[in-house]
């Protein structure tokens, strides 16, 4: 049932009127532009009732709209009440949220937004769009949704920060800072201000627990040619963390970042070298940070060099990625064997949450397990068509053994982050379900076996995954692959496989870890997605045109595919060989976990038989 947002919107409009704001924007992100956020920052969800991870809410004095992408069309339609208009991003004749905002601002109206929740680039672009219709954009320092939320708003987390040991990180934080300073020297810049939480955690080899599923902590950082600072609530730091940082990193209160930026900007202004007066700031940093540093005169907005460095995993991180995916594959195999036995042999009634709870319990037994990497998508039948479905405890259906079951799940281990999707059917699938599954599988294999010259982007290879669906007039409304962190965020940039502008600008590089996850969804009927994690690496080719290195992929996910859903007549001989080789690898790498578990071992052996 949708949440009744009438009173919340009425209170928000009262506050807008007091501050002379005609239209108010509520983005999804927090002040660090995080995709996944802490409960205290779920402002868009609070005001609209829509709980998906992506979207922007726009509220005028008489209307309210929610814009989101294809992953969430179904979910948003179910969760929004009658006060809201759903803007389906990317669909024909549907305005973007910026265009819709500009329409509401016609005739000199004022659009307000918390400047900490959008980037400077977004603010500039939006301001230009609004000006075209006669409106204007202003930053509103006090977040109006927070004022509506009042005392019911959850407290900001204060979880402890932990050291991420060199045995898992593979590189000391001192070396990472040295590399960043080389970048500053190369660009002739005074320093870099860092606000992305995963970048700070990676840079200083620290991890936290402030945001569910993401081992990060609220902080800012500043690195100059001679100093390194960490702005964090010091009560969260253990003695081990303080000893780890030693005298190489100065600790500052989290709240003091804006005052420090003003002082830093003033100090840089006295530097005689004009180039060294500017600071690097990620193009994902907030408008408020940009303004505090002095705006365009003092800031060079760049794609973060830390994001680029973090995305190329070192040898230790790659070995950890391989190892944790074997353990995680064993956990998923045990879960699927258990689930089939319960549903088919024991006739147990299990709902979607009962099942995902069991999976979490199985995972927790494995070495170096810390927690889940996102909320498990455990979906039966029509719910599998909701791309980012979330089963509600106490209000979700029982798993139907005669329908498709889609499970998208992952875990955080000290040595890596996992993300795997498998679609299964424990009964007799329809011909369309088998066809869809097999076309999706062909797409997964096409990415897995792709070879391309260095410098190729994920945008360029996205069609490899879709080609088999396209030939049948089918498609899916999400990207094909995203970067994956190393005991960090399960969604990581800057590279990925899809049609995002960012993916068109970022070549896939040896050492990148990405998902390979094509899908197909029929609303109200079923959904198919298969996801493996792959590591980009240099590969040998018979020839070397242009004397360039060539890039291919190594899959690290070790979980059986669903033979019951395959229409093998649609697979080529090469594709059948790939499936058989993959299943042989899964069997060899995971069978040792089940020497004392006959049920799972037998299931694994059956599921990895040649096709």
Swiss-Prot record:
Coiled coil: none annotated. Its cofactor is Mn(2+). Binds 2 manganese ions per subunit. Keywords: Aminopeptidase, Hydrolase, Manganese, Metal-binding, Metalloprotease, Protease. Its EC number is 3.4.11.9. Mn(2+) 1 binds at residues 419, 517, 531. It holds the Pfam family Creatinase_N_2. PROSITE patterns: PROLINE_PEPTIDASE. The keyword Transmembrane does not apply. It comes from the Eukaryota. One of its GO terms (cellular component) is cytoplasm. Mn(2+) 2 binds at residues 408, 419, 531. One of its GO terms (biological process) is proteolysis. It catalyses: Release of any N-terminal amino acid, including proline, that is linked to proline, even from a dipeptide or tripeptide. InterPro entries: Creatin/AminoP/Spt16_N, Creatinase/aminopeptidase-like, Creatinase_N, Pept_M24, Pept_M24B, Peptidase_M24_C, Peptidase_M24B_aminopep-P_CS, X-Pro_aminopeptidase_P. GO terms for molecular function: metal ion binding; metalloaminopeptidase activity. PANTHER family: XAA-PRO AMINOPEPTIDASE 1. Belongs to the peptidase M24B family. Catalyzes the removal of a penultimate prolyl residue from the N-termini of peptides. This is Probable Xaa-Pro aminopeptidase P. It comes from Coccidioides posadasii (strain RMSCC 757 / Silveira) (Valley fever fungus).
């Amino acid at each position: 049932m949708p949440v009744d947002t009438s009173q919340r919107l009425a209170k928000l409009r009262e506050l807008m009127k007091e501050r002379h704001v005609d239209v108010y924007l509520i983005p999804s992100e927090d002040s660090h532009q995080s995709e996944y956020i802490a409960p205290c920052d779920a402002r868009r969800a609070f005001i609209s009732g829509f709980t998906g991870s992506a979207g922007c809410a726009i509220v005028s004095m008489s209307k309210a709209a929610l814009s989101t992408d294809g992953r969430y069309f179904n979910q948003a339609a179910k969760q929004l009440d009658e006060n809201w208009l759903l803007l389906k991003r990317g669909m024909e004749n549907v305005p973007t949220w910026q265009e819709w905002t500009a329409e509401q601002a016609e005739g000199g109206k004022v659009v307000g937004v918390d400047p900490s929740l959008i980037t400077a680039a977004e603010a500039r672009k939006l301001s230009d769009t609004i000006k075209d219709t006669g409106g204007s954009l202003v930053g509103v320092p006090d977040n109006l949704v927070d004022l509506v939320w009042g005392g019911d708003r959850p407290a900001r987390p204060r979880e402890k920060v932990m050291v991420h040991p060199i045995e898992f990180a593979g590189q000391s934080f001192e070396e990472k800072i040295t590399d960043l300073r080389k970048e500053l020297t190369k660009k002739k810049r005074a320093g870099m201000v860092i606000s992305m939480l995963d970048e700070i955690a990676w840079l200083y080899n620290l991890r936290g627990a402030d945001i569910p599923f993401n081992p990060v902590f609220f902080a800012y950082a500043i690195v100059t040619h001679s100093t390194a600072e960490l702005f964090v609530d010091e009560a969260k730091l253990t003695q081990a963390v303080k000893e780890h940082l030693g005298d190489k990193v100065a600790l500052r209160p989290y709240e003091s970042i804006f005052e420090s930026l003003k002082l830093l900007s003033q100090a840089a202004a006295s530097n005689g070298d004009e180039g060294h007066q500017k600071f690097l700031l990620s193009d994902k940093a907030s408008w408020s940070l940009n303004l505090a540093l002095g705006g365009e005169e003092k800031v060079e907005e760049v794609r973060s060099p830390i994001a680029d460095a973090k995305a190329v995993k070192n040898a230790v991180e790659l070995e950890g990625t391989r190892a944790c995916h074997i353990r995680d594959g064993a956990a998923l195999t045990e879960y699927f064997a258990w689930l089939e036995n319960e549903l088919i042999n024991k006739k147990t009634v299990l709902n979607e949450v009962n099942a995902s709870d069991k999976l979490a319990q199985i995972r927790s037994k494995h070495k170096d397990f810390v927690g889940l990497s996102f909320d498990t998508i455990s979906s039966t039948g029509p719910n599998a068509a909701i791309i980012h479905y979330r089963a509600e405890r106490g209000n979700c259906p029982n798993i139907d053994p005669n329908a498709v079951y889609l499970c998208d799940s992952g875990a955080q281990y000290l040595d890596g982050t996992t993300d795997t999707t498998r679609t299964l059917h424990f009964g007799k699938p329809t011909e369309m379900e088998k066809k869809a599954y097999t076309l999706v599988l062909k797409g997964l294999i096409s990415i897995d076996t792709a070879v391309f010259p260095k410098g190729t982007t994920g945008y360029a290879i996205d069609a490899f995954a879709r080609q088999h669906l396209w030939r049948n007039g089918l498609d899916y409304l999400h990207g094909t692959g995203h970067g994956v962190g190393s005991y960090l965020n399960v969604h990581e940039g800057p590279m990925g496989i899809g049609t995002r502008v960012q993916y068109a600008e970022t070549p896939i590089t040896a050492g990148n870890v990405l998902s390979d996850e094509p899908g197909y969804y029929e609303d109200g009927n079923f959904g198919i997605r298969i996801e493996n994690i792959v590591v980009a690496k240099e590969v040998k080719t018979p020839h070397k045109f242009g004397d360039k290195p060539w890039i291919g992929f190594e899959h690290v996910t070790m979980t059986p595919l669903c033979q019951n859903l395959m229409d093998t007549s649609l697979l080529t001989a090469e594709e059948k060989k790939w499936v058989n080789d993959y299943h042989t690898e899964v069997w060899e790498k995971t069978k040792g976990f089940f020497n004392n578990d006959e049920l799972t071992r037998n299931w694994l052996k059956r599921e990895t038989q040649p096709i």
